[in-house]
Amino acid sequence: MKIDILTLFPDMFAPLEYSIVGKAKDKGILEINYHNFRDNAEKARHVDDEPYGGGQGMLLRAQPIFDTFDKLNVTKPRVILLDPAGRTFNQAYAEELAQEEELVFICGHYEGYDERTKTLVTDEISLGDFVLTGGELAAMTIVDATVRLIPEVLGKEASHKDDSFSSGLLEFPQYTRPAEFRGMKVPDVLLSGHHVNIRRWRMEQSLRKTWERRPDLLENYDFTDEERQILEEIKSEGK
């Protein structure tokens, strides 16, 4: 996968050189390029200006962004604009983006963008109902969530399939050695070696956590008969 990031602050992306994303780059699975669109700004490198019609704040001018985009070595990229008014990012969206060969991120700053910038864009994405100072943190979040889903990045294909949201449910609790720590014990079923019971316990825990914390995820979830039965048992406990 090739990723190009248009930003005023390329140094902010240093964390992407570490951990999973950094390893993907080292393996040659991923290429990331950073482009400071101030370098292509006319008018003494000014990238912003006052909005027509008046209003608070400054808007990013279209010219520096367009000229930077025109210089990218891309064919048919998915072009992502980070915007609080965009479609909310989630795990399903990350899985969708992980299928792409080329991604371009446009990171805003100041009050917003000249609307004409959006003619370059295929996707407007938001992390949620809040506003960040710029799009850089949002872009890093999306890159990390997406890159880890690329085959060969995590090593084991199944290693992300049990993550929260990958299955449509929140992840079940997990434990490692020792079996008891400061009086807190690992559930007996996980020490039993009985794989059927362990699988059912994990299913029950995942459903319980989702029901208690994110019941909205269950609205469109495709239940198996066993899962539906377990969920009904969980619901009946509170009656």
Curated annotation (Swiss-Prot):
Task: Provide the E.C. number(s) assigned to this enzyme.
Answer: 2.1.1.228
Q: Which reaction does it catalyse?
A: guanosine(37) in tRNA + S-adenosyl-L-methionine = N(1)-methylguanosine(37) in tRNA + S-adenosyl-L-homocysteine + H(+)
Its subcellular locations are: Cytoplasm
Name the Gene Ontology molecular function terms of this record. Answer: tRNA (guanine(37)-N1)-methyltransferase activity
What's an example GO BP annotation here? tRNA N1-guanine methylation
Keywords assigned: Cytoplasm, Methyltransferase, S-adenosyl-L-methionine, Transferase, tRNA processing
Q: Where does S-adenosyl-L-methionine bind?
A: G108, L127, G128, D129, F130, V131, L132
Task: Give the quaternary structure.
Answer: Homodimer.
Protein name stated in the entry:
tRNA (guanine-N(1)-)-methyltransferase
Give the species this sequence originates from: Streptococcus thermophilus (strain CNRZ 1066)
